[in-house]
Swiss-Prot record:
Any one GO molecular-function label of the UniProt entry: N-acyltransferase activity
Similarity field: Belongs to the transferase hexapeptide repeat family. LpxD subfamily.
Record's protein name: UDP-3-O-acylglucosamine N-acyltransferase
Catalytic reactions on record: a UDP-3-O-[(3R)-3-hydroxyacyl]-alpha-D-glucosamine + a (3R)-hydroxyacyl-[ACP] = a UDP-2-N,3-O-bis[(3R)-3-hydroxyacyl]-alpha-D-glucosamine + holo-[ACP] + H(+)
Functional description taken from the UniProt entry: Catalyzes the N-acylation of UDP-3-O-acylglucosamine using 3-hydroxyacyl-ACP as the acyl donor. Is involved in the biosynthesis of lipid A, a phosphorylated glycolipid that anchors the lipopolysaccharide to the outer membrane of the cell.
Subunit structure: Homotrimer.
Gene3D superfamilies documented for this protein: Hexapeptide repeat proteins, MurE/MurF, N-terminal domain
Any one GO cellular component localisation term in the record: membrane
Enzyme class, UniProt record, top EC level: transferase
Length: 326
């Protein structure tokens, strides 16, 4: 595919190129600056990587406007406001097929279903979706169009999956939440969970996640949320639009987040807590209270991020000072 055509196709609705392509060539892939060839494209997003640009053999490179005069003459500059986004958009044109169907699926030519897939009663799967080997889909599940369900995923009954959803290998959608009542003698009596999980459009769920079904109603993952590997989401949680949950985040039951929340690795919440829009929680942050919108937090116990960083620096100084006395 010609470079110009690839950019027009990938950028539609997201970005615009701010300069003219003088050297149009047949593009065959993307690569880092260090290893890119003359038929590949790369990007540079920060000035500190300029040394890699000087020695690169890439055919073209996405750059910010202020770096235009730094591009060597043998590389076609591609000026955009967000090179990282440009690279991400173009990468979708060169994604390798994740699964090749070896036998014809009897249900429809537009759905690929791999070996050893188990599909329950009253299941609907949208066109162009891919169900990879060893997936289990329970009764009354709905899966939208252009979804990718990777090997060994289990989707429990009544779950609703939107369009363009990716669920990576080993994730469990809709298992029972952790809920028990307790007798006077100390026995734990299971509370049956009769709700469901709803995952809206354009969500990506990493490998080995667990998203628990609701006791009543639904556990909801809203549009555009991106969830890393090894994340636990408890019953009746609501994850807001375009939220990012990094690996090993844990949300206790009935936690709700606003839109565009970011939680770093191993951060966690207590139950029945609300995290406001655009909140950021640093890795291992322990959220035990509601957090207002547009704030940043960290630490255990949780405190505002600036205060936590000051506390951490002071603590290190104190430890260093005391160690000299030993």
């Amino acid at each position: 595919m010609l470079l110009s055509l690839a950019i027009d196709t990938a950028f539609k609705g997201y970005l615009s190129l701010q300069n003219t392509i003088e050297n149009d060539f047949e593009l065959n892939g993307i690569a880092p600056l260090e290893s890119a060839t003359p038929t590949q494209i790369s990007y540079i997003d920060q000035d500190k990587y300029l040394s890699n640009l000087t020695d690169s053999q890439a055919g073209a490179v996405f750059i910010r406007p202020h770096l235009l005069d730094k591009v060597p003459s043998h590389i076609q500059p591609l000026v955009v406001e967000n090179p990282h986004l440009a690279f991400a958009l173009l990468s979708q044109l060169f994604a390798a097929p994740c699964f090749t169907l070896t036998t014809q699926n009897p249900r429809t030519n537009n759905i690929q279903i791999g070996a050893n897939v188990v599909i329950g009663d009253n299941v609907s799967i949208g066109e162009h979706s891919i169900i990879m080997p060893n997936v289990v889909i329970g009764d009354n599940v709905s899966i939208g169009e252009h979804c990718k369900i990777y090997p060994n995923v289990v989707i429990y009954r009544d779950s609703i999956i939107g369009n363009r959803v990716n669920i990576h290998a080993g994730s469990i959608i809709g298992c029972d939440g952790f809920g028990y009542a307790h007798t006077a003698e100390g026995k734990h009596i299971k509370i049956e969970h009769n709700g469901r999980v709803v995952i809206e459009d354009d969500v990506e769920i990493g490998a080995n996640n667990t998203i628990d079904r609701a006791v009543f109603g639904q556990t909801l993952i809203k549009q555009g949320a991106k969830i890393d590997n090894l994340v636990q989401i408890g019953h009746n949680c609501v994850v807001g639009e375009h939220t990012l949950l990094v690996s090993q985040v844990g949300l206790a039951g009935s936690t709700t987040t606003g839109r565009n929340v970011i939680m770093g690795g191993q951060a966690g919440t207590g139950g029945h807590i609300h995290i406001g829009d655009f909140v950021q929680v640093a890795g291992r942050g322990a959220v035990g209270k509601n957090l207002p919108p547009h704030t940043k937090w960290g630490g255990h116990p949780l405190m505002e991020l600036n205060e936590w960083m000051k506390f951490y620096v002071s603590l290190r100084r104190l430890i260093k000072k005391d160690s000299k006395k030993l």
